[in-house]
Amino acid sequence: MEIFVPKTETEKQKAVAGEIRERFRRENRRPLVFARTYGCQQNEHDTEKMLGLALMCGYEKTGDPANADLIIVNTCAIREHAEKRTFSCTGAYKKLKEQNRELIILFCGCMAQETGIAEKIKRSYPYIDAVVGTDSNHRLPEIIQNVMQTRKRAYLVNSLPHSDFGVIAEDIPALRESEYKAWVSVMYGCNNRSEEHTSELQSPQ
């Protein structure tokens, strides 16, 4: 099994990011991105990388979803009541989408990988533009460009085992939340939600 995403793929995403950035320049726009993270430190690390990719596309970070042109919801499948809380939060963005039809909303992370979640979003949450599994975070520029150009919804969710593609993307920019610390991944993910197999995902309270 190939572990790493090929460098050609990450270079492709950088090129797409450049195209998006040029589009914003022509339109004289300074779009904003807002991210909401649920779950463990790995999710926080993933969000930093997705924000880094968004900035590479020409977005600037905002702390207010009402001002955002791009909203990233990075979800957790382990924490108690995660699904209920996540969908409750995501539901609040429906009004923002009605007010700004150009707003792009991405549903990312571990919950996106769960069986039935993509179908649930397709059926009940039409204002969500893309469902992005953890293996596709590095494709954020491509996903954004696809939504901008076609306004078609996308579902990038892969099933374990990962046999035909890499699961770790290197050389991805990150927007650090702290000047004094950075996350270092020592493992990636989990394919079993039972308590006995997810102790490594438990964080200090």
What are these regions, as identified by a protein language model?
Residues 200-205:
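Short "domain-exit" segments at the C-terminal end of structured domains
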Residues 1-199:
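Proteins enriched for Cys/Gly/acidic motifs involved in redox and nucleic-acid/cofactor modification
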